[in-house]
Amino acid sequence: MSKNERMVGISRRTLVKSTAIGSLALAAGGFSLPFTLRSAAAAVQQASEKVVWGACSVNCGSRCALRLHVKDNEVTWVETDNTGSDKYGNHQVRACLRGRSIRRRINHPDRLNYPMKRVGKRGEGKFERISWDEALDTIASSLKKTVEQYGNEAVYIQYSSGIVGGNMTRSSPSASAVKRLMNCYGGSLNQYGSYSTAQISCAMPYTYGSNDGNSTTDIENSKLVVMFGNNPAETRMSGGGITYLLEKAREKSNAKMIVIDPRYTDTAAGREDEWLPIRPGTDAALVAGIAWVLINENLVDQPFLDKYCVGYDEKTLPADAPKNGHYKAYILGEGDDKTAKTPQWASQITGIPVDRIIKLAREIGTAKPAYICQGWGPQRQANGELTARAIAMLPILTGNVGISGGNSGARESTYTITIERLPVLDNPVKTSISCFSWTDAIDHGPQMTAIRDGVRGKDKLDVPIKFIWNYAGNTLVNQHSDINKTHEILQDESKCEMIVVIENFMTSSAKYADILLPDLMTVEQEDIIPNDYAGNMGYLIFLQPVTSEKFERKPIYWILSEVAKRLGPDVYQKFTEGRTQEQWLQHLYAKMLAKDPALPSYDELKKMGIYKRKDPNGHFVAYKAFRDDPEANPLKTPSGKIEIYSSKLAEIARTWELEKDEVISPLPVYASTFEGWDSPERSTFPLQLFGFHYKSRTHSTYGNIDVLKAACRQEVWINPIDAQKRGIANGDMVRVFNHRGEVRLPAKVTPRILPGVSAMGQGAWHEANMSGDKIDHGGCVNTLTTLRPSPLAKGNPQHTNLVEIEKI
């Protein structure tokens, strides 16, 4: 057993024997196991310590409450929500192993403590300590110079999700305090989309006008649950998440659950009735094969299609559509491609047997209501926009939209208590790019156009990005694609001239900073955080500083206020409005109380720590009002109906500049894509590769916590058939490589992944000698992913990759 396998009195073997999650959570919080070794005296001593409410506000989205025990200005141990009856519908918001390990993040020896400036090349991680005055003066001077020389469009706030839950501390670029500062100083280049949901958020509004789904709790009214790539047991596994609600809802309904995923996930893991492994990027082909059976066996809901939909057949096809341009013609082989989408056709593409496709179609066609949903993995493909719209066709064809127990085909919705956010003000700059295209905007911004690159607000960019704010995010490098190419672009200082990083640790992104500033964590400052991704129970968490400020770490509001001072008294006044961070919170909460008098007072919430409220409507049913009365409650589509055929997409397909292997279609069709299952490149790189969300991290956050790394090792999943061909045994060190880069890590040989497919947890910290061989020993999947965006959303296709794996 290696030294990394035994920490804080708990071995990996013991963890596994103890069902891992619960035991590890306690260990990460500072306990030693077994529990009997804890003396009663120690328990009494801990109970008498000061307890401060905090929260884990990272981008799993669930935002769990933490009770941090503090002694002598140090966090000694961590527990979680202990309020209420802990019954279904009013459950305790219990943090997972990540949140419970926050003490290790707070006290980590690698915390950033002082402002620093770069003294080596970008990416080398060489810095020297400077004063706050020098750091702030440098930032303000560079920002002024950039705006004077290039204009505000040359300033960019990098995509970030390190603090999605916070209000004053929120890092989301469109809603952060950084955005407010820039809007007080003439604005900055906008961005649209996200690394999580670019394709589905773009595509579903063409069908429904929005991207809503029924709440998970509504599964208690379902007869069948079909999940395409939806894995809440790992992506939303905490007490604030929906895994518990999924289990409870199925207990009530006894609904059969079918999981469709290339990987046998923990959401399946014995909970499912059936797992159907599928080749990545082929979900739309499976849907088409199912649709063929539904149509030919008269299992479609024709009255629903006639009344609520546009483009299913010739009766509702828009006048501007070509003859036989409807969905039914596409499925039956009467459209342009003259290919019937039979189960045999679908089986060759998906790898799912013909008889199972037919059986699944009949199950979907006869079980009503059926809850058909998709996670965000299937859409994070190069053809993800088509996939998202295609999966939505199953509830549309069967009339499961807008009813209790049904769904729209989207991911589940949650009930939240709306909070009053720090206003970011209007951005004078109206130009925007896809959040995934920022490296292009640095490298060749003025060549980017609306019809080729998705520039919005004008026909083309006028200037490249010259100044980057990177606050509480690792998307500058680690979470962006093709790290080696990104490194090449960022290291050229003649392109982007200033990078400001505000962080807690020396992340992969922080190594590329010109000025690096030490931020406080959310638990070290006052803030109010709402829930998200938490079923039908909303809550608010009041965070108080768990300790005093240490070293020279500062909160984001203070940092930006000081920059604002240096930009001019008018900017400072407009940014702060004369308020401190605490005064802003009180001001914003007063607005919340005026709109929602049922909320506790500010002081009451501060004392409570957490306030919970169940959805007064019980469950959220997406598009129920439309289903009940489509005339009075039209959808936000051009027709006001569900648009199976989208004239808007037809126009985009006709006018945009696309590559030969890119498809934008008015119908939710299946299309092959670059680096897909049928790509000619498979002769060199035969394995499909995708990343998945891993228990030990939320993206890259918590990726440096040793106890989590020991319990949840970074490995590449490979099927025994593929491993045997390569002479690979479980635990062997292997090289995973393609023409973009190489990663070295252990192999996990398991039948839990489809032959021909490999996978690794995304978010591992990139560790490579970037002035040498560039081989990544940290296991970061983005060493291997592509910078080429998807056709419509111009979004992140990080699950579309081909690789080879060899034993070292």
Residues covered by each model-derived region:
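A glycine-rich phosphate-binding loop feature that marks nucleotide/adenosyl-phosphate handling sites
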Residues: S160-S161, K307-V310, I364, N407-T418, ...
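Long, contiguous, secondary-structure-rich segments that constitute the structural scaffold
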Residues: I556-M608, S700-Y702, D706-W717, I721-I808
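Phosphate/diphosphate-binding loops
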Residues: E497-M498, P545-A564
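Long, well-ordered, tryptophan-enriched scaffold segments
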Residues: R263-A367
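N-terminal export/assembly segments and adjacent metallocofactor-ligating motifs
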Residues: S2-L299, G325, K466, Y471, ...
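Active-site phosphate/pyrophosphate-binding segments
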Residues: K323-H444
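Catalytic or ion-translocation cores adjacent to nucleophile or general acid/base/metal-coordination motifs
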Residues: L520-P545, P755-G756
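Extended redox/cofactor-interaction regions of prokaryotic respiratory oxidoreductases
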Residues: S2-K3, P173-I260, T267, A285, ...
